[in-house]
């Protein structure tokens, strides 16, 4: 009770953290991010610290549930991988915040096998890569990849209408744009040689731009942390010879392997990839 004095007796090396407020917390915790690893694992992150360990996944059996040390994140492993493009609904059962408020709202994510939205290793002409119903539709991190050979300027490489875009700028550099934020490379890519251009939107809202495996630029917009990319057709521009979009934010090492014959190594989601800062 606020204003009341309490005495706490601690054992040697014991630590207790107390939260005190002059207002009662009656707000239920909510799932603010739900992701898949493209295989059998779901990652569910709440908007505050919670207790409990029971979930229901609609039309699926759960193999295991593990809570992370941050007390906000759960890793749910399913007995079998969902069908490609199936909607996976997660329903909290006994999840409560530190004030005892119970989580009641479910959350859903569209499952894509191996996190692939679209993947085309041999683009022969400019045009549509994926129709709107098969496009990215999420507030999670994602990765856009293109192999390009061009001498042009101010040309689109990969875009999902006005939702995001990889392009060649008027100066011949690479750029990656999402919701008002643009990362630009220092390196020119319109030299008639082949270049691998990758844009990554991380879960904290940071945009990163890689050219030929090297980080070339970044940009940040706090509103992009939970900015939702809406459905629209995905298209490739002139000079693009390979293209892909993934519903996961790949890290530096994974980006370096994009487009290689041996393909991407299996990526394991970690807390570092989903624990984000407000600033």
Can you say where each PLM-predicted feature lies in the sequence?
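Extracellular glycan-recognition modules
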Residues: 117-121, 125-175, 201, 206, ...
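C-terminal beta-strand-rich structural cap/linker in extracellular carbohydrate-active enzymes
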Residues: 2-25
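Flexible glycan-contacting loops in extracellular carbohydrate-active proteins
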Residues: 215-241, 267
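Short tryptophan-centered beta-strand motifs in secreted/extracellular beta-sheet-rich domains
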Residues: 193-202, 209
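Short, aromatic/His-centered strand-loop micro-motif at the edge of beta-sheets
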Residues: 175-196
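Acidic, Ser/Thr/Gly/Pro-rich low-complexity segments and short DxT(G/T)-type signature motifs
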Residues: 23-33, 91-121
């Amino acid at each position: 009770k606020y204003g009341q004095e309490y005495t706490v007796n601690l054992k040697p090396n014991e630590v207790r953290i107390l939260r005190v407020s002059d207002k009662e917390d009656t707000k239920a915790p909510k799932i603010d991010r739900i992701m898949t690893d493209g295989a059998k694992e779901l990652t569910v992150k709440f908007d505050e610290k919670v207790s409990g360990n029971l979930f229901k996944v609609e039309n699926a059996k759960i193999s295991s549930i593990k809570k992370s040390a941050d007390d906000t994140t759960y890793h749910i492993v399913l007995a079998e991988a969902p069908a490609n493009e199936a909607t996976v609904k997660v329903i909290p059962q006994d999840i409560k915040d530190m004030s005892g408020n119970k989580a009641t709202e479910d959350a859903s994510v569209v499952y894509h096998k191996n996190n692939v939205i679209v993947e085309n290793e041999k683009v022969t002409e400019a045009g549509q890569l994926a129709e709107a119903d098969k496009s990215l539709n999420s507030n999670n991190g994602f990765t856009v990849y293109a192999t390009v050979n061009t001498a042009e300027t101010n040309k689109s490489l990969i875009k999902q209408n006005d939702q995001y875009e990889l392009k060649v700028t008027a100066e011949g550099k690479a750029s990656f744009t999402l919701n008002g934020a643009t990362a630009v490379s220092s390196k020119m890519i319109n030299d008639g040689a082949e270049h691998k251009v990758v844009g990554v939107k991380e879960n904290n809202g940071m945009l990163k731009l890689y050219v030929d495996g090297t980080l070339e630029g970044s940009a940040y917009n706090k509103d992009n942390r939970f900015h939702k990319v809406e459905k629209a057709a995905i298209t490739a521009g002139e000079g693009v010879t390979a293209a892909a979009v993934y519903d996961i934010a790949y890290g530096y090492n994974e980006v370096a392997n994009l487009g290689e014959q041996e393909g991407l190594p299996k990526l394991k989601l970690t807390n570092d990839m989903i624990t984000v800062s407000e600033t």
